[in-house]
Swiss-Prot record:
Its EC number is 2.7.11.1. The gene is WNK1. SUPFAM superfamilies: Protein kinase-like (PK-like). It catalyses: L-seryl-[protein] + ATP = O-phospho-L-seryl-[protein] + ADP + H(+); L-threonyl-[protein] + ATP = O-phospho-L-threonyl-[protein] + ADP + H(+). InterPro entries: Kinase-like_dom_sf, Prot_kinase_dom, Ser/Thr_kinase_AS, WNK_Ser-Thr_kinase. The lineage of its organism: Eukaryota, Viridiplantae, Streptophyta, Embryophyta, Tracheophyta. This is Probable serine/threonine-protein kinase WNK1.
Length: 704
């Protein structure tokens, strides 16, 4: 047992604060992080948040003889208080210490110092990392320049850009020389000569001077040389800048794209691009580059970056007829993205997913879970953006076999999720599971042992349909982890917007003519292995329809007689399809007993005028057409033709273009009245992991 003396001795071993703020929250150590002409930055500690911060201290006597400097300091503090951006240094608080005649303000601390120090420390940096830094700096500048009136930094350089190396993020700081452009032009000549634009010397400039300084920062990042280092006096720099002579370091840049980008930043003010325009420059469009893993590289990063796909391709498999059994380089494949090894070695691999000019804060990610009586856990991940697009992803979680990181990685691999970090989703899963199971211990999601092998059939870089197609293909039948595929059910809807049109681009009616139908009371939602039919109702009410609601009593079948000669048993295949549909309906009814299917059928029978033929695709070879529901007897016309079921036989490897034509295209702007939601979803039993799944399902609306 430790006595008071022992406690005092232990406390004496701890480093003592050199200074404490008036509230007692922040304590300053004597460790100096940086020192300038009039400001010293110390290491400090936030006792409330339990994190290290930067204690900026300025001596007041340094400004007593210079009111302009004092005003500039107050300007910096005021700006830091009002600016809130992920690429601008965070400001916490400030105060004046009258007794010590100091002005103190607390900002976030950067673990890796300035960008110049960080770049000199890490000499071997791929050009894609430089692009990533450039996008972040431009994003911060765009935020400053978008104010009304605009805010210009006026002293942007690598010494005023700070880095958190463990996250690869850079932020703009040291806004002491920043000015609010209250008029059309600023009228002061301030800054660092090597980074000052020619118009600054003429004291007639606008926010584009920051773009000129940014170009010099890029030049320093790629050459490790300070701009105009060949000059020995500021006057020499002034003469070169005024005459339009570029620094010699620019001509040492061998990459033509880098050099061209820097020249755009250093152009004359009338031709210089803005931060918004530079963010759209092809040089910085790293997200449009194709990601191709190297030889045998199947690490976690393969999931973090997926190629960008057009909206029309988001719900369709991109696998071609030459689906390979592996992704080894020596195996010829037609579905793999084309990448040359020389390009990979020269440009590296893009590990930075998401658009840097679109803050992740605009995307709201929440998770909710439920634990059943038998101990099984079912989770819902909700992803919503500012445009009202909502994605609900439902999946079971096995606390004995699953880890949060492995489930998150599998989710990114199967679903079209490219804008969210795997680690962030994994942390949310860990937190929710820990709340449901107090004894749960988070662990790593990937076993980093030599015996652990990566399943080549799991790594689909295309879309959720692509992963499902690969799973159901012959190449994946022997896959050891194939039972994990299809665990996710995704429901998407629009929180607000215009009316949604459902188009059938590939189906044909009974008369053979392909027509486009606008479905106003139902919406088809694609997911991995299931079909959900949307009905009229508010977005906060959810329901799942079953295949039993689909009438499966065909009057007669039409098919090619040549199939019989090939040994194709049509009756057997139809019976199997009907059995699978009924089986799926029973499972749905058992899993979600709280759903009022009778009431739902009643609502659909009331809409007899909208009795459409639906099409669902089971497997790779057969396409059946079934009616959505049976009309009430009073609603049928005497002259109406009987429902016809058309059956078409497809080849073993269907054309991806034909598959895309059969998918319904949903307009991006959806009506709230047409939203598909899930009512009382968590009141049902948990979804078993061994639930039978169809291979792929599509819904098309055609004329009845």
């Amino acid at each position: 047992m430790m006595g008071p003396k022992a406690n005092a001795a232990a406390a004496g071993d701890l480093p003592e604060y050199a200074e404490v703020d008036p509230t007692g929250r922040y304590g300053r150590y004597n460790d100096v992080l940086g020192k300038g002409a009039s400001k010293t930055v110390y290491r400090a500690f936030d006792e409330y948040q339990g994190m290290e911060v930067a204690w900026n201290q300025v001596k007041l006597h340094d400004f007593l003889q210079s009111p302009e400097d004092l005003e500039r300091l107050y300007c910096e503090i005021h700006l830091l208080k009002t600016l809130k951006h992920r690429n601008i240094m965070k400001f916490y608080t400030s105060w004046v210490d009258v007794s010590r005649r100091n002005i103190n303000f607390i900002t976030e601390m950067f673990t890796s110092g300035t960008l110049r120090q960080y770049r000199q420390k890490h000499m071997r940096v791929n050009i894609w990392a430089v692009k990533h830094w450039c996008r972040q700096i431009l994003s911060g500048l765009l935020y400053l320049h978008s104010h009304d009136p605009p805010i210009i930094h006026r002293d942007l350089k690598c010494d005023n850009i700070f880095v958190n190396g463990n996250q690869g993020e850079v932020k703009i700081g040291d806004l002491g020389l920043a000015a609010i452009l209250r008029k059309s032009h600023a009228v002061h000549c301030v800054g660092t000569p090597e980074f000052m634009a020619p118009e600054v010397y003429e004291e007639e400039y606008n926010e584009l001077v920051d773009i000129y300084s940014f170009g010099m920062c890029v030049l320093e990042m790629v050459t490790f040389e300070y701009p105009y280092s060949e000059c020995t006096h500021p006057v020499q720099i002034y003469k070169k800048v005024i005459s339009g002579t570029k620094p010699e370091a620019l001509y040492k840049v061998k990459d033509p794209m880098v050099r061209q980008f820097v020249e755009k930043c250093l152009a004359t003010a009338s031709r210089r691009l803005s931060a918004r325009e530079l963010l759209k420059d092809p040089f910085l469009q790293v997200d449009d580059l194709v990601f191709c893993p190297g030889d045998g590289d199947y690490s976690l990063m393969n999931y973090l970056r997926q190629p960008y796909l057009e909206h029309a391709y988001s719900n369709v498999s991109m696998m071609s007829n030459g689906l390979s059994e592996s992704i080894d380089e020596d195996t010829p494949t037609e579905d793999r993205w084309d990448c040359e090894d020389d390009d990979i070695k020269a440009d590296g691999i893009d590990l930075f997913n998401g658009h840097e000019d679109e803050p992740l804060g605009n995307v709201d990610i929440t998770i909710k879970g439920r634990k059943s009586e038998d101990g099984s856990i079912f989770l819902r991940l909700r992803i919503a953006d500012n445009d009202g697009h909502v994605r609900n992803i439902y999946f079971p979680f096995d606390i004995e076999a699953d880890t949060a990181l492995s489930v998150a990685t599998e989710m990114v691999a199967e679903l079209d999720i490219t804008d969210h970090e795997v680690t962030r989703i994994a942390e949310m899963i860990d937190g929710e599971v820990s709340a449901l199971v107090p004894d749960w211990r988070p662990g790593p999601g990937i076993e980093e042992s030599q015996d652990t092998t990566y399943c080549h059939n799991c790594g689909s870089n295309v879309s959720s349909c692509g992963s499902l197609y690969a799973y159901m293909s012959s190449a994946a039948r022997g896959c050891q982890c194939a039972e994990l595929h299809g665990r996710f059910e995704e429901i998407t809807f629009q929180a607000n917007g215009e009316q949604t049109d459902l188009q059938d681009s590939g189906g044909s009616s009974d008369d053979g003519g392909g027509q486009t139908q606008h479905v106003k009371d139902q919406e088809a939602v694609h997911s991995n292995g299931f079909v959900q039919m949307g009905r009229r109702g508010p977005p906060d009410q959810f329901c799942f329809s079953s295949f039993q609601e689909q009438s499966c009593s065909p009057r007669h079948y039409e098919y090619d007689t040549s199939l019989q000669a090939k040994g194709f048993d049509m009756k057997h295949e139809v019976k199997m399809a009907k059995y699978k549909a009924r089986k799926m309906a029973h499972l749905r009814r058992a899993i979600h007993p709280s759903l009022d299917f009778d009431n739902l059928n009643g609502e659909r029978r009331m809409k007899s005028s909208l009795n459409k033929l639906q099409s669902f695709h089971i497997g790779k070879n057969h396409n059946f057409r079934i009616p959505t529901c049976e009309r009430s007897p009073g609603a049928r016309d005497a002259e109406e033709d009987p429902d016809i079921f058309n059956l078409a036989y497809h080849s073993r490897h269907p054309d991806p273009g034909a598959q895309r034509a059969r998918h319904c295209e949903v307009d991006a702007q959806s009506s709230p009245d047409l939203m598909f939601t899930a009512r009382s979803y968590y009141t049902g039993a948990q979804l078993p992991t061994n639930l039978p799944r169809t291979k792929s399902v599509t819904l098309n609306a055609v004329d009845a």
